[in-house]
């Protein structure tokens, strides 16, 4: 399972003109389930995300986690993170989990995030979404927990 994290001062996602999720300072996590992923990969990815030290401490060093700063978490599903661009000019998404598996893992990830962190907002799985953000830094970090079957 993978995520592209962006440290933000604010972010929101809209579907059909209606805001479905919005945060202030925190992390925007674009999340993708891959072929072979299970809840175990989702749990490991979330644990890493919540503890990743990407926020500044008093000295200006990236030394504080999302949990330590009490920031918001905006989780948006994005199967295109699994794109394979090695052949031709059209990306292949064959590495992404099937839609039903992707939805189940996304919902599991969000439920666990809500159980472990205060402020969690979301997009809508499978919808065409508009994501607005102000990237702080900019800080953009890819995270990936490979499926156990690929290890």
Swiss-Prot record:
The keyword Repeat does not apply. GO terms for cellular component: cytoplasm. Gene3D superfamilies: D-tyrosyl-tRNA(Tyr) deacylase. A Gly-cisPro motif from one monomer fits into the active site of the other monomer to allow specific chiral rejection of L-amino acids. It comes from the Bacteria. This is D-aminoacyl-tRNA deacylase. Belongs to the DTD family. PANTHER family: D-AMINOACYL-TRNA DEACYLASE 1 (PTHR10472:SF5), D-TYROSYL-TRNA TYR DEACYLASE (PTHR10472). Its main location: cytoplasm.
């Amino acid at each position: 399972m993978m995520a592209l994290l962006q440290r933000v001062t604010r972010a929101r996602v809209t579907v059909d003109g209606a805001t479905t999720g919005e945060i202030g300072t925190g992390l925007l996590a674009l999340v993708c389930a891959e072929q072979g992923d299970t809840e175990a990969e989702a749990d490991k990815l979330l644990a890493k995300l919540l503890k990743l030290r990407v926020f500044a401490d008093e000295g200006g060093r990236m030394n504080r986690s999302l949990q330590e700063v009490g920031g918001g978490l905006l989780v948006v599903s994005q199967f295109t993170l699994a794109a394979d661009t090695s052949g031709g000019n059209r990306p292949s998404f064959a590495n992404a989990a099937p839609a039903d598996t992707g939805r189940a893992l996304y919902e599991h990830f969000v439920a666990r995030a809500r159980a472990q962190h205060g402020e969690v907002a979301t997009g809508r799985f499978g919808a065409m979404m508009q994501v607005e953000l102000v990237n702080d830094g900019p800080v953009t970090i890819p995270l990936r927990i490979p499926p156990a079957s690929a290890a």
